[in-house]
Amino acid sequence: MSELCPCGSILNYHECCGPYILGTQVAAKPAILMRSRYCAYVEKNVDYLIATWHPDCHAQEWRESIIQGFTKTVWHGLTVIAETPGRHPDEAFVEFIARFTDADNAQITAMHERSRFLRIKEHWYYIDGIRPSLGRNDTCLCGSGKKHKKCCGR
């Protein structure tokens, strides 16, 4: 890959998320791990996704479900909104919006999540996330410019 990184940075893939996915570098911050996980979804790299889920999640059990999801989803972009510390130094949160098209719906949809990450030794892991609520009159996250109720919120 010699193109720009799918995570939305202005860097080449090999200078951005590639080294994390290849395992030659460790993500020093949760936002970096978030970006590399997004790239893994784009690349359909189930092994990296499973390796970066917190061990308590037992993500290996979801392998087939994750692979099945790859066949239905086309990713269109990632916006990292904020990275915030948690209650202790080994916890942090990353809020993001990921845009995608699902095979069942030709329209671009957006997923807005505040993901929680935990650190074990020097490695960060995704553990869970919450989806902030969006009002019906708020602008839709998919980027259409329409109100949520007239777009993805139908």
Swiss-Prot record:
SUPFAM superfamilies attached here? NTF2-like, Sec-C motif
Signal peptide (residue range)? none
| UniProt-listed InterPro entries | NTF2-like_dom_sf, SEC_C_motif, UPF0225, YchJ-like_M
**Pfam families to which the protein is assigned, alphabetical:** SEC-C (PF02810), YchJ_M-like (PF17775)
Sorted alphabetically, which HAMAP family does this protein's record hold? UPF0225
Q: Which family does it belong to?
A: Belongs to the UPF0225 family.
The family database entries (NCBIfam families) matched by this protein are listed as:
PRK01617.1, PRK01752.1
This protein is called UPF0225 protein YPO2172/y2149/YP_1971
Organism the protein comes from = Yersinia pestis
Which lineage is the organism of this entry classified under, starting from the top rank?
Answer: Bacteria, Pseudomonadati, Pseudomonadota, Gammaproteobacteria, Enterobacterales
